[in-house]
């Protein structure tokens, strides 16, 4: 077989020619490997008709090398490149880090359909699909596949060795970031769930964005970020950091400082910590610990991201309290021991008060289900209580929760699930996308159906369990819930 061959590449408008080595083509492209096994193996030239001559030329010249930089190419070029790679028998691999703009989503879906739907192409659609996309344009089969991918989750493990991410299904580990043991408490980070990136505020007060697949640093803040914690607002694509003076807002792509919100100044000595955000990213919820002559006084505060208005304190206590934010509604629940209040951020009023008449009066976990329909309480005896947002009742209980204007609140004394305490870890409890509950004991992870006493799955992660913090990372919750509701409607 002759070594060289002339490739005559044409599309509807232009033509180009490439002199290439058959052996190199066969090694890098399954299409040419199969071609040269037949009569074309003895040919001097071959004619190829493609959709885009320039794209085919670049792909052949680069020998299909995915390290070639495509960041400066147009989206039309990128989509033609995906089709061309598929034509030459190459696997689908996302070639750019940027999120596909909304105006190109239909073309993205058409391109993936031409390539063929499999896990990699559907995952690419799922990670780029806007939450306001018209779902009736997609088939139910495709929506179910997207929903399944959006239900995937990861374990983000923080310990004295650094940060590691584990796939929730395969349990495969990806080492992300290493830092000194003594700086653990100074680290703050948040996960950008639509781009598969991690933002870290390091001990030098510098923000960095890491691609969790390549481990590359894709952006660094130009100045210092003097914040003690950060959070990601997906709908605004920005990072919000908090400190005693207020808030700093950074662009989530290039980490440029784009705004500030001044905090309340009525106290001289105050520690401010971030709690969370509302489901629509309009509100930031934070706690202030005010130092007095008699110790600390704890306050629950709200900030409006758009206007910078500070609301509160909406709750005061001499003891530390818990507060969590609903993933789907603009409501929060706060309190301590066995007294909790459900509060609306939009109406700025109490929705309901919960009294859990249980012993001991100590809860190690309070969380919303990811569909926002239930609140789950777990106490130090591994007993779980589930309260419905819709019915304002504990599951399997006839006792409704009283509203604030009711004189005699009712209690949840017979509505509980008792987990196997020998297997149930009281640290790092989280809710999974399927509303199962995950707990850790040492480096053993157990996944529980909330109605069952025994775990449905247990496995060990290869981690140093000393001082480990494990966080469950999920994909686009809003879009996953929207697809679920659309399919069920």
Swiss-Prot record:
InterPro entries: Quinoprotein_ADH-like_sf, WD40/YVTN_repeat-like_dom_sf. Residues 3-73 form the BTB domain. Belongs to the mimivirus BTB/WD family. This is Putative BTB/POZ domain-containing protein R773. It comes from Acanthamoeba polyphaga mimivirus (APMV).
